Amino acid sequence: MHAVIFDFDGVLADTERLHYAALRDTLAAEGWSLSYDTYLAEYLGYDDRGCVTVFASSQGVTLDNGRLDYLLRDKEQRYAEHLAAGRVLYPAAAPCVSRLGAAFPLAIASGSLRGEIERILAANDLRHAFHAIVGADDVREGKPHPESYQRAAEALGVTPGAAVAIEDSPWGLQSARGAGLRTIGITTSYGPEGLTHADHIVSSLDEVTPALVRQLLAGNG
């Protein structure tokens, strides 16, 4: 059996800028500044806990657990407020999920919290399409560690080598490849030069078909 595992932010949902805006505002309240370019270059691959911890360390600050948890709750609340402004799925997301879901079991492996993902999917009538969702709160190690993809493949009942991951970042690709998946890179957050480790690169989910997935799993990507 073959399967497809999606990243979420930057692949199905146009939420990377919303995550950045929420993080920027949380950090600004602490007197810190983070540009979008720096976020993309250095922090996009982390889950929230890793991102805030590493950023604080770059400022010479070690956060105790209480302070870190407070900042994470603040960022989560700000992100929810940004999300409330409207629909965030890419136009090609639902058709792609329908197309691939008719051929393969689907899962999500993401650095976002599972509840955030499920709320967006439910609001767009897509929650039923995914057999498994692995969020940041489901793993001990975030991307680029392979744990999230390992857990997603296990939940689907497939070996990692029988699955294709769709990712938008170098860290996500590293995570999927480390778990043993074939990979499709999508240029929503980075250009092709940032996705050189992908087995195949697309500019839109419109280009991702069951035939492409089968081709990659046959080793012909």
Model regions and ranges:
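Helix N-cap/coil-helix junction residues
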Residues: W32-L34, V61, L126, G157-V158
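Asp-based, Mg2+/Mn2+-dependent phosphohydrolase catalytic module
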Residues: M1-H2, L113-G221
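Metal-dependent phosphoesterase signature
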Residues: S57-P95
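Anion (oxyanion) recognition and catalysis
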Residues: A28, L100-G101, R177
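Short, acidic loop-to-helix structural element flanking the phosphoryl-transfer center
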Residues: E81-I108, R114, E118
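Active-site neighborhood of HAD-like aspartate-dependent phosphohydrolases
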Residues: M1-A41
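Helix-loop "lid/cap" segments that line or gate small-molecule binding pockets
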Residues: T26-L27, D47-L63, I120, A153
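An amphipathic alpha-helix signature
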Residues: Y20, R24, D48-T53, L72, ...
